[in-house]
Amino acid sequence: MKHNPLVVCLLIICITILTFTLLTRQTLYELRFRDGDKEVAALMACTSR
């Protein structure tokens, strides 16, 4: 079975980012990148049932 190389590359990148995040952060709900005067924040809103 052949796989699309683009899909495989995207999957590897996503797994790498997720692994890096799990190793360096205590939570996956908030992720912030700062570069000088710029900041990018990704927040996940979730509620418990």
From Swiss-Prot:
Q: Name one GO cellular component term.
A: plasma membrane
Q: What happens when the gene is disrupted?
A: Partial loss of Obg-controlled persistence.
Keyword annotations for this protein? Cell inner membrane, Cell membrane, Membrane, Toxin-antitoxin system, Transmembrane, Transmembrane helix
Q: Which residues cross the membrane?
A: 4-24
Under the heading InterPro entries, the entry gives:
Hok/gef_toxin, Hok/gef_toxin_CS
Membrane disposition = Single-pass membrane protein
Output this protein's name.
Answer: Toxic protein HokB
Which species is this UniProt entry from?
A: Escherichia coli (strain K12)
The encoding gene: hokB
